[in-house]
Every structure is written in structure tokens, then in C-alpha cells.
Curated annotation (Swiss-Prot):
The gene is argB. Signal peptide: none annotated. Keywords: Amino-acid biosynthesis, Arginine biosynthesis, ATP-binding, Cytoplasm, Kinase, Nucleotide-binding, Transferase. This is Acetylglutamate kinase. It is found in: Cytoplasm. GO terms for molecular function: acetylglutamate kinase activity; ATP binding. It comes from Thermobifida fusca (strain YX). It catalyses: N-acetyl-L-glutamate + ATP = N-acetyl-L-glutamyl 5-phosphate + ADP. Catalyzes the ATP-dependent phosphorylation of N-acetyl-L-glutamate.
Length: 302
């Protein structure tokens, strides 16, 4: 009779063997991870996230992290007595607010992520989207009742220069990138981290885009139907977009943009689940929702 301890060891070995085809397929491939939500504020989840990213690196993948920092920005604005408002789900970013956003994302959040990862080795290197002209953005307007509304220094990424990121990856490093972008005129913009991550994934020719959220993934007809959609095509997602909640729209638009731009797979995962990334990447079952390119009539990707 096999002891409980021996059985647990055998189960672990089975899990490792199950990962073999995924390790083989993804060895040397780039994976862009958008990090945000509750996973950024819970100390245990933050530590587990750092471990997962380092695991990917040791497993032979080339992880890149793009992060936001909404909760931390809100906390600093409140502490400094600066009022923050939202229009159509987007933060109205005055020059005063932009200064705080930049300080928090680049000077606090980025450094914390770099520090957590580097507890496991000299891997992480912090960057702003401004550095080496990585992200260039143009002003974005919110749409209210079909009319464009000025929301200040909020930008949409229109150009990506990924050379510096590639150099870091080639050197075995893990780039950690804050979602700040330059303008062609020399200013700075606050950009959505989901869309920035998607743009970078396309520019790098990444094998996967992974977006961490505070929900399990995309539901078939929430709240009427809470059945999780495990996978869907780009066209199916595009058809579903108008029905989604405002919080899910930028995340799913990022997935759509990524696969339409040539990224083979985009995933939305619950960052509150410990090791969710590893479950999605290295197991047959996976977790969350995976978006795939459309198939052409010949059976290949469109």
C-alpha cells in the first residue's frame, strides 16, 4: 500500500510530466503579463506573483510584465487631498494628477515589483513606457453619449519601440514596465495598462498575452449565466464586446487586439487564484478564458 506521503509525491511528479509538452512548446518564447487588480495589493498574492514570474524564467520562457497601479494611485491622491474623477471609466488626468500617477507607478509600484522578483535572483529591471521611446501615445478622448470628451493627459498607445525590452530579454532579464507613455511632442500620458500590454505583445511577437483580473474570466451571459467561457475566437469576442461590463471591456479589447495583431493566444485569468498563471500555461485543464485567432476556411489561422 502506498503511503499518503508517497502518493502526494507521485501526484506532484504526474503534474510535472503533464507540463512537458507546454514546456517544450514555449521554451524560449516571450510571454507578456499584464499585472493589476487585487493581486497587486494582497501581500501573499504579490509574493506568489513574483514566484510565478521567476518560475517562468527558470522554465525557459521570456516573461515581460506591464503593470498599472490604480489602488496605489487612489491612495496617494486621497492622502494628498487631490480629487480624482472618472469619465466613461477613464481617470480624468490633470497635470497635477499626472505628476502623482507618474510618481506612484514609476517610483513606487515598479520598484516594489522589481524588488519582489529580485529576491529570487538578479532578474528584474524596471522601466517606464517613456524609456527608450518604448510607448508613444496620442491623446485619448472619452466617448459620452456619442460625443468625445477631453479627459486630460490620458493617452492611447500608437507606436511601440521594443528594442530595449528585447535587449533585456536577450540578456536573461525580466523587464517590468509601468504604463506611462511619451507623446511625440515630449509630454507624458497615462495609458491603460491592458492596451499597453497588448501593443507590446504584438510588437515583440509574443507567444501569449496574459491579463490578470479580479474575476475568473469571461462569463457566457453574466449575471444570468455564470458559466465560464474557457476559450473563444476573436470574432466571437468581437460580437460579445458590446454586452460586457465597463470593467471587462479594456481587458477583452486588449486580448482581441493582441490576437488580431498576430499573438497566438491571449488569456484572462483571476489573479486572486494562487499560481493561476502556471495552471493556465502548464496544465491541460487551464483556468480563465483563452482568446484564439479565427480559423480560415483552409483550417489555419486567419
Amino acid at each position: 500500500m502506498i503511503s499518503r506521503t508517497r502518493q502526494e509525491a507521485l501526484d506532484k511528479a504526474k503534474t510535472l510530466i503533464e507540463a512537458l509538452p507546454w514546456l517544450s512548446a514555449l521554451h524560449g518564447k516571450t510571454v507578456v503579463v499584464k499585472y493589476g487588480g487585487n493581486a497587486m495589493t494582497d501581500p501573499d498574492l504579490r509574493a506568489r506573483f513574483a514566484e510565478n514570474i521567476v518560475f517562468l524564467r527558470y522554465a525557459g520562457l521570456r516573461p515581460v510584465v506591464v503593470h498599472g497601479g490604480g489602488p496605489q494611485i487612489n491612495a496617494h491622491l486621497e492622502r494628498l487631498g487631490v480629487e480624482s474623477t472618472f469619465t466613461a471609466g477613464l481617470r480624468v488626468t490633470t497635470p497635477e494628477t499626472m505628476e502623482i500617477v507618474r510618481m506612484v507607478l514609476v517610483g513606487q509600484v515598479n520598484r516594489e515589483i522589481v524588488g519582489l522578483i529580485n529576491e529570487h535572483g538578479p532578474f528584474a529591471v524596471g522601466m517606464s513606457g517613456e524609456d527608450a521611446h518604448l510607448f508613444t501615445a496620442e491623446r485619448k478622448y472619452a466617448m459620452v453619449d456619442g460625443e468625445p470628451v477631453d479627459i486630460g493627459l490620458v493617452g492611447e498607445v500608437v507606436d511601440v519601440q521594443p528594442g530595449a525590452v528585447r535587449s533585456l530579454l536577450d540578456d536573461g532579464r525580466i523587464p517590468i514596465i509601468s504604463s506611462i507613455a511619451r507623446s511625440a511632442e515630449g509630454g507624458v500620458y497615462n495609458v491603460n495598462a491592458d492596451t499597453a500590454a497588448a501593443a507590446l505583445a504584438v510588437a515583440l511577437g509574443a507567444a501569449k498575452l496574459i491579463v490578470l483580473t479580479d474575476v475568473e474570466g469571461l462569463y457566457a451571459d453574466y449575471p444570468v449565466n455564470s458559466e465560464l467561457i474557457s476559450h473563444m475566437t476573436a470574432s466571437e469576442l468581437e460580437e460579445m464586446l458590446p454586452t460586457l461590463s465597463s470593467g471587462m471591456v479594456p481587458k477583452m479589447e486588449a486580448c482581441l487586439r493582441a490576437v488580431r495583431g498576430g499573438v497566438p493566444q491571449a488569456h484572462v485569468l483571476d489573479g486572486r487564484i494562487p499560481n493561476a498563471m502556471l495552471l493556465e500555461i502548464f496544465t491541460d485543464e487551464g483556468v480563465g478564458t483563452m482568446v484564439l485567432p479565427d480559423k480560415d476556411p483552409a483550417g489555419g489561422d486567419a
